[in-house]
Amino acid sequence: MKRTLLALTLVTAFFGSHAAFADTNSTRDPYITEADVSAVHGVNWDNYVQAETDWNFRQVTDKVGVNQWIHDAPVSKDNQTVIRSNRDVVYSIAVVDVSKGATFSVTDKNNDEFQIIHIIDENHLTHKVVRRGESVTITPDDLSGGNYVYLLARTKDNGNLADTQRRQKLLSFTANSAKPYPAKGFTEQDVVDYRLKLINNVMTGKVTVEGVKGFGQTLNDVVDKDYRYAAAYGWGGLMPTTAQYLEAVPGQGAPECQEWRIPQPKLNRELGGYWSVTTYGPDGWIAKDKFYIAGENTKDNGDGTSSVFFNCGGELAKYSLDVMKNWAAIVRFYEPSDVQETLDYLQTLRGISVKPVQ
């Protein structure tokens, strides 16, 4: 099985050149006296986001250079390169030189499923989303800094491998320059170690982070602390206007036949909005072959609710996922109709637990 614990786009349910360095000399929050944010050699609190972003850029440019797509294969139990991998989309990634302008397009011809190009600048800002039927031109003036952008395109995996791969190839861009990306000189291990330091602060309860406040177009749109932790815990995550995540299914973990019955979400179907449930083993890796279900394949109860089942057979098997003891899940919602309404909806879901099927 192909596994890399810390690989491209550590996007979990967190929720979320010298010219590229943002002005990060902001007043620090009092929490830093409690959490360990001390420097790891050349990587520190002030430059970490740029170092992390540079690390992600280099994972692409070291393989294919600039202005070249890498189309990932769909996730499965035997093909998962990132912990808590996302099954409902396939990724296409690239680093593009926009120093003289570049245009990014997602066609809507022969393309009726969710698909976006997510554009990220060298400060892990901008977060521009290009949707089906749209073309967007980006120059350095549109960024918070730098001359290069990272593309993290997402194409809905509809279960038809050939069609999914066909739609990936519909993604396009044209760039007017192709200068090699100039790495910023950070040592890879220092970046990884500092990332783990910040993640450990969250996991041990030394700091609380609001992922939705860590992603924005400019520094004025983010909270300083959340911005830095978001880069560690969810680099490449989408802003809540495009996707929102439920970090766990309440009551998860037991291996008996159970049902999770929830109100159906309000998503923008015209933009291809949909939702899904993906399950994992206790170590965060996909553990079973039947680990994922799209919202449209859950059981419609006819009363405005849908049900997902776990380890159930018989007539419920087609709505059921296979799980092991101490399993966990992430629920993903794409293209919410209303951002705040969906945030409130997620809070409601946190109070709805799975129940044994009698």
Residue ranges, per PLM feature:
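Gram-negative bacterial Sec-dependent N-terminal signal peptides
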Residues: M1-A22
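A compositional/structural signature for long, glycine/proline-rich flexible linkers
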Residues: A22-Q358
